[in-house]
Amino acid sequence: MTVTTFSELELDESLLEALQDKGFTRPTAIQAAAIPPALDGRDVLGSAPTGTGKTAAYLLPALQHLLDFPRKKSGPPRILILTPTRELAMQVSDHARELAKHTHLDIATITGGVAYMNHAEVFSENQDIVVATTGRLLQYIKEENFDCRAVETLILDEADRMLDMGFAQDIEHIAGETRWRKQTLLFSATLEGDAIQDFAERLLEDPVEVSANPSTRERKKIHQWYYRADDLEHKTALLVHLLKQPEATRSIVFVRKRERVHELANWLREAGINNCYLEGEMVQGKRNEAIKRLTEGRVNVLVATDVAARGIDIPDVSHVFNFDMPRSGDTYLHRIGRTARAGRKGTAISLVEAHDHLLLGKVGRYIEEPIKARVIDELRPKTRAPSEKQTGKPSKKVLAKRAEKKKAKEKEKPRVKKRHRDTKNIGKRRKPSGTGVPPQTTEE
């Protein structure tokens, strides 16, 4: 049965009221897939890119469990949520408080960059849900300041990024401390690769695997097209022109490498476009300042790599620009999911050089719809567009040449004469007489 409304999920009235306050009536694909098995107490292995409602997909069943089975007296946390970054932990906590605002449930946050005294209340007062980063939480566990024995559900958000950041051992240590738990939910942007699958096998027991990309209806809120660029200079000129348009009120520009982040940020500043940037090696204070500048409207352009932008939620993004084309359809969906949130519409623009056309075709096939081209009159490309039939497969001419080379190599090989009696089944295996190999002798 397909779930079309939140009321069909048999959620508590207080949660339905909170969803209504936020304007949410229909569950997204990942919510419809993940919430029912989670409510049944099953372990869940979920995959969904940013912008698909992944956070509510695990928060709603966790909150419902606490309401269905209230404890008689106060105690340590019953739900533990682990995130890779402080920003994501704060966002998840805020989201949980919004969903729990008509209940009496308590939510606390434990992250790095915060003095111990600020976490003292978490240890001394009743907490139902704790959202934490692994490093700081593990420190408190080792100091015996945090009690994991009451944790009933362990939730891992952005698990793939936690692995990328080298937190696998820390998470497994924490999972060991919560070994009395009844349920584990693991969510990731992608489930591709042996690392995430092996990790999930070690932590989850007979999980229900759910995967949901944005539906066609959700993607239609995002206008997608591309501009063809002759070279890097032309591509930068296109980006500058598009960022200066009045409709680009808040934009994220994605690049593939950290080095390009600094280059592009400087080029945009030279063109009169004030911007901020995020890259993997930034200290926490600078990351917070960059995000604050963007959300407060002091700048309206953020340049970022995929890894650096993971785990941050920036509201009201009007445009997403792929300055460097992503190498996978998953990454493309993850990027464009930054816009068109909360029922709004958004725009995703890709800037494509000749060598990017194969990636463009790959993305189009993945999302099962072609991305259409547009042209700016004063910045028309001067080079010819690659053939639309270009697929990345070798042409017939190339295949014919390869076949000829293969035949030539076979002709060069010396032919060994085979006699019929050498190939007959004659019982005990022996060397064919035509090999010219002398019999072995043993020395006494």
Swiss-Prot record:
Disordered, as annotated region: 382-444
An annotated Gene Ontology molecular function: ATP-dependent activity, acting on RNA
Pfam families (alphabetical): DEAD, Helicase_C
The EC number(s) this enzyme carries: 3.6.4.13
Ranges of Basic residues composition bias in the record: 394-406, 414-432
Biased composition (Basic and acidic residues): 382-391
Catalysed reaction, written as an equation: ATP + H2O = ADP + phosphate + H(+)
InterPro entries named among the record's database cross-references: DEAD/DEAH_box_helicase_dom (IPR011545), DEAD_box_RNA_helicase (IPR050079), DEAD_helicase_SrmB (IPR028621), Helicase_ATP-bd (IPR014001), Helicase_C-like (IPR001650), P-loop_NTPase (IPR027417), RNA-helicase_DEAD-box_CS (IPR000629), RNA_helicase_DEAD_Q_motif (IPR014014)
Key words of the record: ATP-binding, Cytoplasm, Helicase, Hydrolase, Nucleotide-binding, Ribosome biogenesis, RNA-binding
Disruption phenotype: Cells lacking this gene grow very poorly at 20 degrees Celsius, show a severe deficit of free 50S ribosomal subunits and accumulate an abnormal large ribosomal subunit. Disruption also impairs the processing of both 23S and 16S rRNAs.
Uppermost EC category: hydrolase
HAMAP family: DEAD_helicase_SrmB
Classification via NCBIfam families: PRK11192.1
Protein's UniProt name: ATP-dependent RNA helicase SrmB
Underlying gene: srmB
